[in-house]
Amino acid sequence: MLKMGVVLFIVLVLFPLATLQLDADQPVERYAENKRLLNPDERRGIILHALGQRVCCPFGGCHELCYCCDG
C-alpha cells in the first residue's frame, strides 16, 4: 500500500512539476531564435531605441528610429 502511494505521488505531483519547468523555457528559446533572424540594422535599431538613442538616417530616409542629419 505504501509503495502504491509513493508511485501515485511521483506520477501525480513530481512528474507534472518537471513538465511545467520545461514548458516555461520554450518562450525564451523562441524569443532568442526570433532575435537571431533579424538583420544587423534592425537589431541595432531596436537596441538604440531601447536605450533612447537616435542616429542619423542614411540617404535622407527618415523614420522613427533615426533623425534627419544635415550633412
Swiss-Prot record:
Domain of life: Eukaryota
Entry's localization field: Secreted
UniProt keyword Signal present: yes
A cellular component annotation (GO) from this entry: extracellular region
Signal peptide residues on this chain, from the entry's feature table: 1-24
Any one Gene Ontology molecular-function term assigned to this protein's record: toxin activity
Modified residues annotated as Aspartic acid 1-amide in this record: 70
Further remarks about this protein from its record: Negative results: Shows a very weak inhibition on Nav1.4 and Nav1.8 sodium channels. Intracranial injection into mice does not elicit symptoms.
Protein name, per record: Conotoxin mr3e
Annotated source species: Conus marmoreus (Marble cone)
